[in-house]
Structure formats: C-alpha cells, structure tokens
C-alpha cells in the first residue's frame, strides 16, 4: 500500500488535506476493467470507468473505477442541488440558486483537497461527470436567452 500508514497519518495530522489518496497495485489477470464495471453497476446506480492512455499507446496506464459517490452535484437553470451521503449512509440535500455555479464548485473542491504524491497519476479522485453545452450561459449572458432542446442538466457531477 502506498503511502504507508505512517505517511498517511503524518499527512492527515498536517490539517492541509480533506482526502489522502491511497494506491494498491492489482494484477488484472482475472477481471478486466469492464467486468469490474459490470459488478460495480450492480452495486450502485452511480459508477464510472475512466481509462488513461497516451496518444501513441493502445493500452491504458491506469483504470479509474468509482461508485457510490459521497456527493452529487447538479445544476439546471441556476438551481444547484447538492446531495451528501455520509459514511453511515445518512443523506442530506441542499438547494440554492446561483448565477455562477463555478464559484460553488470551487468552494466544494477546496474541502476535498489532496496531496500530490510521487508515483501517483495526475487524477487521484474528485468530481466526475459533465458540463453540458448549456453551461456556457453562466459565462456568456447572451446565451441565457437560448433554451437547449435536449434535457441535459447544465452540470451533473
């Protein structure tokens, strides 16, 4: 396991980080990432698989799998909804109207800051989802008058 337990304890005691990434290498000779994704899909309606690869490589260097998020964030027409799921499965939800969802997203991300550690990929966790085309209306007011025909949320993370 990387980092060691003592290193994790030291990072946690520094008070600088809301999360500390932990890595364990697993040989993928029994299940492919797609097979693991199918298993996770049965356990949670929210799951994802991200594969990394350099442009000249066929195979990915890392497979990122995630499920059962502790936070869900959506925004439609300025109405931002944040759903928290704690470790004891207690759920809370808050709603607010905003003209600038980016501010709220940055505020949330500060709480989950993690250290950059040697030997780890650039992405060690965080928000996963999408910003739709309609999200541009928050940066460009003239686009607010146009209503998209699709039923996508402006943000779904």
Task: Cite the ranges covered by each PLM segment.
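Signature of the chorismate-utilizing enzyme
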Residues: 1-157
